[in-house]
């Protein structure tokens, strides 16, 4: 995924974050302040904001770009933000007895945007045993790759893992410096085009594993249930709008998200690697605490990040998900 090295790599809360937010145009409207990195999957929130889908439900939403997970999580902990958008495995690492927040809706999943680059002679992960693999440790890349290894009966101990950003890993692979890399677009397409190796596996083969969610503090959810419902309604309307007005939607989202995605053509290309979640997909994904994709994913997150001592507490479905708003009234 483009630029996730700043999007999903950091871990640990940082103190003393100072953020400024514009005043709301409507004084009596509900308020919600969210932090996130620059990412195509967050486009529907900007679309809902700029098309007025949040406002028509009585909600003003501030979307603040902060290119570091630790910084926006620190801002949430300090009360400067009400929540954030991130992968569900990422936010699990910050959940503690003293820092309560829960996912209220899912935004998207990686659907081909992440992958493993290898040389042409490699046909399985087992062929990489003992070899060097470039990967961003502590990021969603490590989480996803460990799921792949688990399916093959392998662990990182079977490989020689080198910690580097996803962009650096791709560059090192293309330069012939390492035999394998865990990275994302546009590097996957570049390797396919130049035929400098191949993509052994990408996230289109593992749907529902790299999932972005919006999480809000437990206090915000408790004190502002109507605003949370308004947010989810506006988000769903934006996702439905994309289905029928793609060109207009991509132009609005590109401008809103900005950064490396400010060109609508670049945004459209990046969007090929994600799947936006509408209401039906949210209901399917979250399932229940007893059964469903989210429950399984959270168990994997607790297991994998726990094995690397990244967790502050044992996290289960009920401690990280609030299902109350997935089907708004």
Q: What are the roles of these predicted feature ranges?
A:
Residues 89-90, 161-162, 168-262:
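Pocket-lining segment of extracytoplasmic ligand-binding domains
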Residues 26-163, 179-186, 201, 208:
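Short, glycine-/small- and polar/acidic-enriched structural segments
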Residues 39, 66-70, 85, 135, ...:
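Soluble non-cytosolic domains of exported or imported proteins
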Residues 76, 128, 145, 173, ...:
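Buried hydrophobic packing residues in well-ordered domains
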Residues 17-25:
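C-terminal segment of classical bacterial N-terminal signal peptides
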Residues 222-310:
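Secondary-structure end/capping motifs
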């Amino acid at each position: 995924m483009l630029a996730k090295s700043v999007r999903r790599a950091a871990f640990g809360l940082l103190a003393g974050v100072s953020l400024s937010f514009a005043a709301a145009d409507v004084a009596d409207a509900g308020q919600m302040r969210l932090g996130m990195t620059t990412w195509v999957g967050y486009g529907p929130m900007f679309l809902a904001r700029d098309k007025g889908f949040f406002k028509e439900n009585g909600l003003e939403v501030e979307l603040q770009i902060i290119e570091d997970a630790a910084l926006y999580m620190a801002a949430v902990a300090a009360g400067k933000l009400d929540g954030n958008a991130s992968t569900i495995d990422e936010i699990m690492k910050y959940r503690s007895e003293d820092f309560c927040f829960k996912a209220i809706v899912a935004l998207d999943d990686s659907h081909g945007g992440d992958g493993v680059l290898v040389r042409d002679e490699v046909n399985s992960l087992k062929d990489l045993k003992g070899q060097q693999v470039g990967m961003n440790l502590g990021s969603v890349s490590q989480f996803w790759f460990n799921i792949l290894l688990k399916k093959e009966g392998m662990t990182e101990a079977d490989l020689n893992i080198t910690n580097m950003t996803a962009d650096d890993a791709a560059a090192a692979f293309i330069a012939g410096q390492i035999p394998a890399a865990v990275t994302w677009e546009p590097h996957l397409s570049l390797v396919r085009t130049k035929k400098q190796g191949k993509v052994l596996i990408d996230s289109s083969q593992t749907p529902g594993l790299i999932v972005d969610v919006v999480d809000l503090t437990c206090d915000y959810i408790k004190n502002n249930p109507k605003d949370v419902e308004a947010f989810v309604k506006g988000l769903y309307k934006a996702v439905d709008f994309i289905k029928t007005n793609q060109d207009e939607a991509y132009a609005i989202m590109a401008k809103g998200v900005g950064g490396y995605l400010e060109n609508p053509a670049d945004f459209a290309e990046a969007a090929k690697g994600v799947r936006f979640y509408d209401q039906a997909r949210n209901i399917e994904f979250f399932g229940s605490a007893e059964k469903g994709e989210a429950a399984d994913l959270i168990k994997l997150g607790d297991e994998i990040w726990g094995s690397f001592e990244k967790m502050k507490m044992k996290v289960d479905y009920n401690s990280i998900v609030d299902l109350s708003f997935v089907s708004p009234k």
